Amino acid sequence: MEIIHIGTDIIEISRIREAIATHGNRLLNRIFTEAEQKYCLEKTDPIPSFAGRFAGKEAVAKALGTGIGSVVAWKDIEVFKVSHGPEVLLPSHVYAKIGISKVILSISHCKEYATATAIALA
């Protein structure tokens, strides 16, 4: 498999905490799928998980070379957890339009930051 693009993102967890405190469900429903919200809200402190998924979506959009809005919307990029780490689900038309077969994603967070790196493969 050939690497097409790489995307990375980092965000302060406090920014996500403030945004959710200010905009609540309106923000959550605009950015995160139901499954993503359910996963994060099961955590004692869901904010780091939301921040990680936000960074993941940004990294994927960068790896696609499109950003958010032109080819993919926030909720078109679904980040979910499997036994070996995060996986990405995109609408089928995105794979064909961009010319990729898979996106690999890594997410990490500490007390202050969440970061993600995505690799789009041909």
Curated annotation (Swiss-Prot):
Q: Which GO terms describe its molecular function?
A: holo-[acyl-carrier-protein] synthase activity; magnesium ion binding
Enzyme Commission code: 2.7.8.7
Q: Which InterPro entries match?
A: 4-PPantetheinyl_Trfase_dom, 4-PPantetheinyl_Trfase_dom_sf, ACPS, Ppantetheine-prot_Trfase_dom
Give the UniProt keywords, A-Z: Cytoplasm, Fatty acid biosynthesis, Fatty acid metabolism, Lipid biosynthesis, Lipid metabolism, Magnesium, Metal-binding, Transferase
| Enzymatic class | transferase
Places the protein is found: Cytoplasm
Q: Name one GO cellular component term.
A: cytoplasm
Give the reaction(s) catalysed. apo-[ACP] + CoA = holo-[ACP] + adenosine 3',5'-bisphosphate + H(+)
Q: Which residues are Mg(2+)-binding?
A: 9, 58
Pfam families from the UniProt entry = ACPS
Would I find Nucleus among this entry's keywords?
Answer: no
Q: Which family does this protein fall into?
A: Belongs to the P-Pant transferase superfamily. AcpS family.
| NCBIfam families reported for this sequence | acpS, pantethn_trn
Name listed for the protein in its UniProt record: Holo-[acyl-carrier-protein] synthase
Q: Which organism is it from?
A: Chlamydia pneumoniae (Chlamydophila pneumoniae)
